[in-house]
């Protein structure tokens, strides 16, 4: 057995991204400017395809953005359970979009779940 003294340990169990085309009623793959969270994450990233500049696929800066929570979770047709990460991840993206564009950001959710110390304040 190997013993290692470390300050932090990260256990990454892995995950599989949800295919947003499984929820066609949101328009992913049908409407040009409907994105997955991972695609938005790449847009706001300085090393992303637009060097951190948040633009739509037609190259325009959005004036308003809608973020739909729980896509693929809490849904009888996909997964019935709450992932416990989507709300905070969506709120993080909302802050980043607002910071990068000044656009008005609207969050659409069943109910906001922020289970953690200081998380509810992040929502405000």
Residue ranges of model-derived segments:
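Residues forming the flavin
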Residues: 1-124
